[in-house]
């Protein structure tokens, strides 16, 4: 697995990796992680196409999903530990 790029973002860490003819977009926030695998053949402009996919609308959805993940984890944690 090879790191292609790391993109700056104020809320989470975005890494683009390459492995087995796939681009892997890894987005991390705290203990949570979202990973998206995109075959190289599906992209016409290589890694530049990944940059286009990571638009503001997508990143807002990612942020909302992190919020949901945090809530789900806290709910289950408190259900079994308190």
Where are the model-predicted features located?
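Short Gly/aromatic-enriched secondary-structure transition segments
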Residues: 38-42
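Mixed-charge, Lys/Arg-enriched low-complexity segments
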Residues: 43-82
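N-terminal acidic leader/helix
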Residues: 2-37
